[in-house]
Amino acid sequence: MANIEKQAGELQEKLIAVNRVSKTVKGGRIMSFTALTVVGDGNGRVGFGYGKAREVPAAIQKAMEKARRNMINVALNEGTLQHPIKGAHTGSRVFMQPASEGTGIIAGGAMRAVLEVAGVRNVLSKAYGSTNPINVVRATIDALANMKSPEMVAAKRGKTVDEILG
């Protein structure tokens, strides 16, 4: 399902989906391919890319380039999430919550690939609604982007981390 490769520069790349699509024109159908990939450094940086070309390798290459350009930083807490989070994109909704050490990545399909390359080692998650890989990846990255560390919350409120954590 998701192929992983190590790149120089220590970026992990995963291929989530390759689809054959067609455009119908007067002379028949024009076939092309789309590829969905995620890239991460395994330490809180993750991005996804969607590429389209007449050949599969070209589509994958375009998707990888877009993924490297669109990376976000995620505030992780010792290999898990900071707090329970929800994300949504079109018909896909995802819910993720932190898990104790040894739980592993409990996630399905496209969500698992995103979490693995982001560096999350322990998480409980569930995808609701549409399980279209593109929308699930976008919803997962939306959720991770909205996650706040205690330091970020403390800075925003003008308090210390100890006051925030109680």
From Swiss-Prot:
Keywords: Ribonucleoprotein, Ribosomal protein, RNA-binding, rRNA-binding. It comes from the Bacteria. The N-terminal domain interacts with the head of the 30S subunit; the C-terminal domain interacts with the body and contacts protein S4. The interaction surface between S4 and S5 is involved in control of translational fidelity. The gene is rpsE. GO terms for biological process: translation. Part of the 30S ribosomal subunit. Contacts proteins S4 and S8. Residues 11-74 form the S5 DRBM domain. It comes from Pasteurella multocida (strain Pm70). The keyword rRNA-binding applies. Belongs to the universal ribosomal protein uS5 family. Gene3D superfamilies: 3.30.160.20, 3.30.230.10. This is Small ribosomal subunit protein uS5.
